Amino acid sequence: MPLPPRMQALPARVPRRGVLLAAAALAGWGAGRPVLALPARTLVFPRDRGTHPAFRTEWWYITGHASTEADKRAFGFQLTFFRSRVDATQGMASKFAAKQLLFAHAALTDVQGKKLWHDQRIARGGFGIATASESDMDVKLRDWSLKAEGHQYIAELPSSDFGLKLGFEETQDVLLQGKQGLSRKGPKDKQASYYYSQPQLAARGSLRLKGQDFAVSGKAWLDHEWSEEILHPDAAGWDWIGMNLTDGSALTAFRLRTRDGGTLWDGGSFRSPKGGLYTFSRGEVIFKPVRYWKSPLTQTTYPVEWIVRTPADFYTVRAVIDNQELDSRQSTGAIYWEGLSELIDSNGKRVGMGYLEMTGYAQPLRM
C-alpha cells in the first residue's frame, strides 16, 4: 500500500526515540490533549507485553550480539517495532481512519566487514498489514514480525541485502526499570514511561547478509516502553547504553543533554547475577567522553568511547565500529549514532557487550 505523502520522507532507519519524535510532527500528537503524570501501577504479564493503544508512544526493541560457531564471525543486530497513536483521527468513525501508525526497523552490524546494514517498514494499523495484539507481544508489519511464545520471542525480518530470523529465550526474570516499572525521563512528573527490560536473552537463529546465511548464537536485550510524554523541551539529545555483562549482570544508563552539553536528567539500573537490583538516582550516572570520531559524511563529531560512572563501577564504553551513523537530513532532519559497543570495567577487563545510542550531536532534536 502506498504511503501517505507526508510519510514518504521518513528515512530508512531512525533511532527508536527519533522515530517517535518524527511521528509526533507527522501524526499531530498532542493536539489539544493535556499530558498528565502517569500513575504508579503493577505491570501484569503477559498482558503488558502486548500493545497499549491508549498511549501515544510505544516501542518493542531488541539488540544483541551473536557469532558463528565455526569461525566466530561477530555481528550486532537490532530490531524495533514502534506504535504511535494519531490524536487527530481518534474521533473518526471510518474504518479507514489511520488511528495508529506502526513503524519498524532492523539493523545488522557486520564487525568483520566494518559496515552497518539497515532497512525499515511503515504502515497504518489494521487491514492485516500492520497489527499489534493487546493480549501479548505479537506485532506484525507486512513481512516483519515479533511474537512472544511463553518464555521465548521469535523475530523474522527479511530484507533485500540482509535479514534476521532469530529466537530469544528468557534466562532471567523481567527487570522493571525505575520505580517498579515507572521510569522518569525528566524533571517533571509527566516526563515518564512504563518501562521494563528482559536482559540476558539467549539468542539463536540465522542472519542473512548479501545472500549468505550465517547460523549464529549469542546474547540479546529486550526493552518495551510506552508513554504519553516524548521529550523535555530543553533536551537537545541523549546518550544511552544497555549492556549484558558476561557474569549475568545487566546495566542500563542514560542521560538527557541540554544544548550546552550539560545533563538535564540521568538514570538507569544495575542488576547482579543473583537478581539484586539497584535503581540509579538522579545524579548517580555521569557520562564523560574519551575518544571522538568525525563522520566523513556529515562532519559531525561523536564520542565513540566513554567513561560511564555508575554506582556499580566506572566503565569504559567503546564502539566496536566507529562508523555507525545515519544521516537523514533529507527526511526527519535527524543525524545520530547507534551501534554495537563493548563494556570494559575499571580494571581494564572487557565484561560485556551491548548498544550505545547518541542523538543531538549534529543539531538539537526538534519536537
Feature roles, as predicted:
Residues 1-14, 22-28:
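N-terminal secretory signal peptides
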Residues 3-4, 32-367:
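Structured soluble/peripheral alpha/beta segments that form catalytic or ligand/cofactor-binding pockets
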